[in-house]
A protein has these predicted regions:
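Membrane-embedded helix-loop-helix hairpins and adjacent transmembrane boundary segments
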Residues: 1-523
């Protein structure tokens, strides 16, 4: 699919959509009253802004394309990444958010700095920056660049630059509030487009019953046998929690909207709303891939499942809208990541280490410079990723997360739940533990790829094993460390009893999720 396949109406919709986005960005920037809104939106975000922002950051074009591909090849089992997540979003709401908001922090490295000291904060700040550059910016730009390259037939570096310029505009012009407001607009369109695609596909295939008969029975099973090569149940049960804790509870890009919550209740309800939105991931993003298998079983490249459905089922004009929405979702992810990158570097490195008396104007200017520098570095990494051949997009994404997650998950969990954890243990986990985890990941993905060396366990089991090793190391070091210090952040003082409405909302979500898992049991 190239640009010459787009009708005049498609082009009109694309242009109109981006004009609307620019208007929203300008409006949000004019509403900004002080520089701090660049980072935490003046701590004024409501629950719906938080929910849409977290979901929008999570669901980019890369995940749309990859999820449809996973649905085409394995069914809804990949939906565990969406539905199992509610457990860890709940953990964010009731365990992490009260401490984050009570401490009035700007970044997560700042929180760990109060727990373990300045050395840990410095290490974690650099760790977070590297994580954002690789897992959020480069991988997202790579997947989005594939889409743009297919449509406009331009090189990857040009695709990445175009998308970065648009994303950087919202990050620098309106700060997090611009991203939050555009997320609401984008996600409503995303729901509409994806729901329309699913309904149109179900209509053409002959309904739900016809679809169920057209694909293998195990396509409706959330848990597969442990000898399944793609998604065995044990790695999902043991390995995903490591990624879940890191991704939903400790990743700056995901947690940033919660840090900007008006109060704890808004933050907890925003996280709950994210959990409800995650239910939509399966019918909106995975189900189209299953429908594509029923309608076009001869499709050779599963990564083309989503756009195959779009080009075959949607009329002229709708194709342009789909491209606009996918690009908008990419802008949401990249914009949030650029904002998080700027926040961490500026507040945790520049102000803390180099310019503690910097003015607000200087802080904002530094944030803009960091945003541009991060954008350029991410383009270079994207080009490097583009040179890698033969790797499945969905598995690459989940594998990278699986190898990044163990050190961070261990440090945050032990830092909160075990007071005897020492600074030395945390620092060793973040340095040696990270090097060990990343080293195993490089061996698994590139040096001795699992597709050729079948002795490797599933990458999610590797994530679990790495977490166990790092955790054991932290326990051992903490017990042997004679320089044990008291926690500098009094956890009890930052706790607040959840509102009844929050408890009710989470109870209802839990009941629904249990029901979904009981229903999709493969029978």
């Amino acid at each position: 699919m190239h640009a010459n396949y787009l009708d005049t109406l498609d082009w009109g919709i694309l242009i109109a959509y981006f004009l609307i986005l620019i208007g929203i960005g300008i409006w949000a920037s004019l509403k900004r009253k002080k520089g701090s809104s660049l980072f935490l939106a003046e701590r004024s975000l409501k629950w719906y802004h938080i929910g849409f922002s977290m979901w929008g950051t999570n669901v980019g074009p890369s995940m749309l394309i990859a999820s449809a591909s996973a649905g085409f090849t394995t069914g809804i089992v990949s939906g565990n990444y969406a539905w199992y997540a509610f457990v860890f979003i709940c953990l964010l709401a009731f365990v992490f958010a009260p401490r984050y908001l009570g401490a009035r922090i700007t970044t997560l490295p700042e929180f760990m700095g109060r727990r373990f000291g300045q050395s840990t904060r410095n290490i974690l700040a650099w760790y977070t920056i590297v994580t954002i550059l690789i897992s959020w910016l480069a991988l997202t730009l790579f997947a989005g660049g594939i889409l743009i390259r297919q449509v406009f037939d331009i090189p990857m570096w040009q695709s990445a630059l175009i998308l970065l310029v648009i994303s950087a505009f919202f990050t620098m012009a309106g700060g997090l509030k611009a991203v939050a407001y555009t997320n609401v607009f984008q996600m409503l369109l995303l729901i509409f487009v994806s729901a329309t695609l699913t309904i149109a596909g179900l209509y053409k295939v002959g309904g739900v019953s016809a679809l169920a008969e057209a694909v293998p029975a195990d396509y409706w099973n959330l848990f597969r046998p442990n000898d399944d090569p793609a998604f065995p149940w044990l790695p999902i049960i043991l390995g995903y929690p490591i990624m879940g804790v890191w991704f939903w509870c400790t990743d700056q890009s995901m947690v940033q909207p919660v840090l900007a919550a008006k109060n704890l209740k808004e933050g907890q309800m925003g996280a709950n709303f994210t959990g409800w939105l995650k239910i939509l991931d399966v019918p909106l993003y995975i189900l189209p891939g299953i429908i594509c298998l029923a309608l076009y079983p001869g499709l050779k490249n599963p990564d083309e499942a989503y756009m195959t459905m779009v080009t075959n089922l949607f009329p002229v004009g709708m194709v342009g809208l789909v491209l606009a929405v996918l690009t908008a979702a990419l802008i949401s992810t990249v914009g949030s990541a650029l904002n998080a990158l700027s926040t961490v570097f500026t507040m945790d490195i520049y102000v803390k280490k180099f310019r503690p008396l910097a003015s607000q104007k200087e802080i904002i200017r530094t944030g803009h410079v960091v945003t541009m520098a991060g954008a350029l570095i991410s383009v270079i990494i994207t080009i490097a990723i583009d040179s890698i051949k033969g790797l499945n997009l969905f598995n690459v994404f989940q594998s990278v997360l699986g190898f990044i997650a163990p050190p961070m998950a261990a440090v945050f969990l032990f830092g909160i739940f075990w007071k005897r954890t020492t600074t030395m243990a945390a620092n060793m986990a973040l340095t040696f533990g990270t090097a060990f985890s990343m080293g195993v990941g490089i061996l698994y993905l590139w040096v001795f790829p699992a597709e050729k060396y079948t002795a490797w366990p599933h990458f999610m089991m590797l994530s679990f094993y790495l977490f166990v090793v790092i955790s054991a190391g932290m326990i051992l070091v903490s017990l042997l460390d004679k320089r044990r210090q008291e926690c500098t952040l009094n956890m009890k003082k930052v706790m607040e009893k959840p509102a009844k409405s929050v408890i009710l909302a989470w109870t209802l979500l839990t009941i629904i999720m249990i029901g979904l898992y009981l229903f999709f049991n493969g029978h």
